Amino acid sequence: MKIFDVVIIGGGMTGLAFAAALQSSGLSIAIIESNPPKGFSLEQFSPRVSALNLASSQWLEELGAWQGIAQQRVAPYDAMYVWERDSFAKIEFNTQGLGVPQLGHIVENELIRQALWERVAQQKTHEILLRTESSSLVRSVSNADVQNPVDFLTALPRSLGVTDRNAILTLEDGQMLSAKLVVGADGANSWVRKQADIPLTFRDYGHSALVCHVQTEQPHTHCARQVFSSDGVLAFLPFAQENYCSIVWSLPPEQADYLLHCETSEFNKKLTVAFDHKLGLCQLQSKRYTFKLTARYARNFAQNRIALIGDAAHTIHPLAGLGVNLGFQDAKMLAQAILANEQLGVDFGEYRYLRHYERNRKVEAAKMLLVMQGLKDLFSGDHPLKKLIRGLGLSATDKMGLVKEQLIKQALGL
């Protein structure tokens, strides 16, 4: 049996950031991941992007991963413009008076993951357990090999058991791992959450999200834009190139499915109209993808020997791609709790030492879920009175400098 201090299930952005945060702890850590990154290419754009707020980019810099991101492709944005179609409702945010150069950065998820993977792979205290397509190959690669400076083993988790003193993982190849703490960073359909019998509250948003990349006739001027309509939300997130954007279009499933399969020319027309011609003619530049939107909230974020972070604990509506910031804050707080309790010489895997993390992050996730649901409900429906109230409310807020400043500071994570 292999013995570790922490075993992380899931090598996505949140799980890898959590591992990187423990780099100076001296703890032994294993990461179990079935789909390692294949390398990042500047030749093409990956479909999913995130809007990293200031707190997230600063933390990635502390972890030593931001340099790897910035050297590749990152798009800072310094303004955000939100409006409602066929209404006078609008609000605009910028960096004025904040003392920061930008509101955040638009970064492709695969680039964030690749940079974190390379950062974690350089650390000798981590062992990466991977399922490979070809065989049960085991090989060691020195840290001088920047391609794959990790140990590769074929592995997927098969069962999870918990005792008072440790958690026991059995892998599909028969290996057994022991850990003080197992961290579920394995996404919305978390295997860890299911194994731990943690109940899940969820709500179907009744929408699907369509994502793709487009070229716009007019430059985006490093402004993130979002338009609400009676049946959906459309966000344009600026890329580094001045006429390229990633879009996230939240729509009823039947509309999303139509837009997924319609002719490119038809898609371009409908997208341009839906965006109120704000950036002129929009032209599709990538494959289109859709995914169902569901809000999820785990009843427990922690229990004895088990903790959940990121989408394993909660998922929110992908308004403007902000969800990853919530997951990074989970990872940061859990890492801080582990490091603090390790210094005190206590068993950080016991539930009593995980309760502070759980209480704090459950509150923050619940607040974000309520805000996202509130925005969706606020802009749903096109009754004239409701549109008037929305218009008056947004326009009034747009003129309240102090209120806007507090709202944007909250979004920045300050």
Where are these regions (language model features)?
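Conserved N-terminal helical subregion
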Residues: 3, 74-156, 162-195, 203-208
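FAD/FMN-dependent oxidoreductases across multiple families
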Residues: 144, 153, 257-349
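N-terminal FAD cofactor-binding segment of flavoenzymes
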Residues: 44-81
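Conserved FAD-binding catalytic core of PHBH/FMO-like flavoproteins
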Residues: 60, 170-281, 286-288
